């Protein structure tokens, strides 16, 4: 069979016309070096800051340093298979994580992938991990309480929905315990909780999951885990991923609470990445933008107004405000709150709960130091009954600590000082609370009423907690309607005041303190 030249040209023309025309212009680069998960790439002229880069084997990275002739990136995951000379592609996308109610009750990694063995998550929406915080006009003042269920915190350092309250203290002072109690106490309140574990042991994270499951709190909780065995990049990204998940609920007119446990480890991971990227080190070898690292994260926690929610939901949700409350945790070294990262986060947040080693070791748990703990905006959000009854608690504790220091050297004390010391001892004892035994507002009000009205005067300090527990049981059995009324209204009416006074008097008169 012979073909003449005209037939050959016809065949070639037909082939060219039928070729698929879907071409894709992609910028590619070459890996120059791999150092502990930080990769330097030659080329990629069009790469954007924070853009996802595609490595061989379906691995992705994040472009962080854009230099004249190279790009510095971190790998999100395993990097052992990446070697010098590998081809890298730009994706034109920024890092996104799945968000929505489908994640509730699940344990995910920093990229939103499930790690609890319960199958894939069919999330209908996704969100960028880095987002601009709501502006001034979109925000609403904090005026709704977020109850932690802990007497010492709800009475002295109240937290409002949309607030950022720092939990700070040395290791082993009960920081995580306070945060977990706050999560457990949101059961039935409609608040969705996100617990972000950064740089912790995998066994510790498993223990947290088990405790939350035992207390029925996983039904309203998402856990984002970036354990100590994960790369520095994933530990750096985890808080932003968790925040994006919490923002979904805030922006759809719901309330959410996020715990970052802890941001000290995130700062260390970011320092590691920055030093490997050869960014100039500053104080304590942290990079110059470590303040911005935390400020851009914590500014995303806010209470937003109904107009903002309506706009973001395209009119589906009307007349509802949303909030994201943040409880960042910072670990100090030997109680040094003047170190670089602690001072940064203190200045960003709306107050701090300072937990002290000495108090913890003395059996005062939660080990809250009332003197330097503060809530800058929570007072406006405090429940009326707690505000009314708990006003003197903080002052009593602060005065007691001051007097107790002087009383050690004084042999003869006047009556007023002795009275103040005994009152302070009782208050200190009553602020103790076991872990996972959170109280409702009405139950808390019973104790605060007794302290404020002097019904605990003359009671032996050792029996104060037993008296409190027995009185609560008595009230639940005989005056359940009183508790229900206070719980519903959040106020103590004159009628209920009289009933409560009578209940205390009759119970105390017949109580055996032996």
Swiss-Prot record:
Known catalytic reactions: ATP + H2O + 4 H(+)(in) = ADP + phosphate + 5 H(+)(out)
One Gene Ontology CC term in the entry: proton-transporting ATP synthase complex
Catalytic activity, EC: 7.1.2.2
Chain positions of site Required for activity: 373
Gene3D superfamilies: 2.40.30.20, ATP synthase alpha/beta chain, C-terminal domain, P-loop containing nucleotide triphosphate hydrolases
Primary enzyme class: translocase
SUPFAM superfamilies: C-terminal domain of alpha and beta subunits of F1 ATP synthase, N-terminal domain of alpha and beta subunits of F1 ATP synthase, P-loop containing nucleoside triphosphate hydrolases
GO MF terms held by the record: ADP binding; ATP binding; proton-transporting ATP synthase activity, rotational mechanism
Alphabetized UniProt keyword annotations: ATP synthesis, ATP-binding, Cell inner membrane, Cell membrane, CF(1), Hydrogen ion transport, Ion transport, Membrane, Nucleotide-binding, Translocase, Transport
Superkingdom, taxonomy of origin: Bacteria
Residues binding ATP, per UniProt: 169-176
Entry annotated with the keyword Membrane: yes
Membrane topology: Peripheral membrane protein
Subcellular location: Cell inner membrane
Keyword ATP-binding: yes
Listed InterPro entries: ATP_synth_asu-like_sf (IPR023366), ATP_synth_asu_C (IPR000793), ATP_synth_asu_C_sf (IPR038376), ATP_synth_F1_a_nt-bd_dom (IPR033732), ATP_synth_F1_asu (IPR005294), ATPase_a/bsu_AS (IPR020003), ATPase_F1/V1/A1_a/bsu_N (IPR004100), ATPase_F1/V1/A1_a/bsu_N_sf (IPR036121)
Pfam families with a match to the protein in the record: ATP-synt_ab, ATP-synt_ab_C, ATP-synt_ab_N
Oligomer and partners: F-type ATPases have 2 components, CF(1) - the catalytic core - and CF(0) - the membrane proton channel. CF(1) has five subunits: alpha(3), beta(3), gamma(1), delta(1), epsilon(1). CF(0) has three main subunits: a(1), b(2) and c(9-12). The alpha and beta chains form an alternating ring which encloses part of the gamma chain. CF(1) is attached to CF(0) by a central stalk formed by the gamma and epsilon chains, while a peripheral stalk is formed by the delta and b chains.
Family recorded in the similarity comment: Belongs to the ATPase alpha/beta chains family.
Function according to Swiss-Prot or TrEMBL: Produces ATP from ADP in the presence of a proton gradient across the membrane. The alpha chain is a regulatory subunit.
HAMAP family (UniProt xref): ATP_synth_alpha_bact
Protein name: ATP synthase subunit alpha
Gene: atpA
């Amino acid at each position: 069979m012979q073909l003449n030249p005209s037939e050959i040209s016809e065949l070639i023309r037909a082939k060219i016309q039928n070729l698929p025309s879907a071409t894709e212009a992609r910028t590619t680069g070459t890996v120059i070096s791999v150092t502990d998960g930080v990769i330097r790439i030659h080329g990629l002229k069009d790469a954007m800051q924070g853009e996802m880069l595609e490595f061989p084997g379906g691995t992705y990275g994040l472009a962080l340093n854009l230099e004249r002739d190279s790009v510095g990136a971190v790998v999100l995951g395993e990097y052992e298979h990446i070697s010098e000379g590998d081809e890298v592609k730009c994706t034109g996308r920024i890092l996104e994580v799945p968000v929505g109610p489908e994640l509730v009750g699940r344990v995910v990694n920093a990229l939103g992938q499930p790690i609890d063995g319960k199958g894939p998550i069919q999330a209908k929406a996704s969100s960028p991990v880095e987002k601009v915080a709501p502006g001034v006009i979109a925000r609403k003042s904090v005026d709704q309480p977020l109850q932690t269920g802990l007497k010492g915190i709800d009475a002295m350092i109240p937290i409002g929905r949309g607030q950022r309250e720092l939990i700070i203290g040395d290791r082993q002072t009960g920081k995580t315990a306070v945060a977990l109690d706050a999560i457990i106490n949101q059961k039935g309140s409609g608040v969705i909780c996100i617990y972000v574990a950064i740089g912790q042991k995998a066994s510790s994270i498993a223990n947290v999951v088990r405790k939350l499951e035992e207390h029925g709190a996983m039904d309203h909780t998402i856990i984002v885990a970036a354990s100590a065995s994960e790369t520095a990049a994933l530990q750096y990204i985890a808080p932003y991923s968790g925040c994006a998940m919490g923002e979904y609920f805030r922006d759809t007119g719901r309330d959410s609470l996020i715990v970052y446990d802890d941001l000290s480890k995130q700062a260390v991971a970011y320092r590691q990445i920055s030093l490997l990227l050869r960014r100039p080190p500053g104080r304590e070898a942290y990079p110059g933008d470590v303040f911005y690292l935390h400020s851009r994260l914590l500014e995303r926690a806010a209470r937003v107004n109904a107009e903002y929610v309506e706009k973001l939901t395209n009119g589906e949700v009307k007349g509802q405000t949303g909030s994201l409350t943040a409880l960042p945790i910072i670990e100090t070294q030997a109680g040094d709150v003047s170190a670089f990262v602690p001072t940064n986060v203190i200045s960003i947040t709306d107050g701090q709960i300072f937990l002290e080693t000495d108090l913890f070791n003395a059996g005062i748990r939660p080990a809250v130091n009332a003197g330097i703990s503060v809530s800058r905006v929570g007072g406006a959000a405090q429940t009326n009954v707690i505000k009314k009854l708990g006003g003197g608690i903080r002052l009593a504790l602060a005065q007691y600590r001051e007097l107790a220091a002087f009383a050690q050297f004084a042999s003869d004390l006047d009556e007023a000082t002795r009275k103040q010391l005994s009152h302070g001892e009782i208050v200190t004892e009553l602020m103790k609370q076991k872990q996972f035994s959170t109280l409702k507002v009405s139950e808390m009000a019973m104790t605060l009423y007794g302290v404020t009205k002097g019904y605990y005067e003359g009671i032996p300090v050792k029996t104060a907690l037993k008296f409190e527990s027995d009185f609560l049981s008595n009230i639940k059995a005989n005056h359940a309607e009183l508790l229900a009324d206070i719980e519903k209204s959040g106020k103590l009416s004159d009628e209920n005041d009289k009933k409560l006074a009578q209940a205390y008097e009759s119970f105390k008169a017949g109580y055996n303190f032996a």
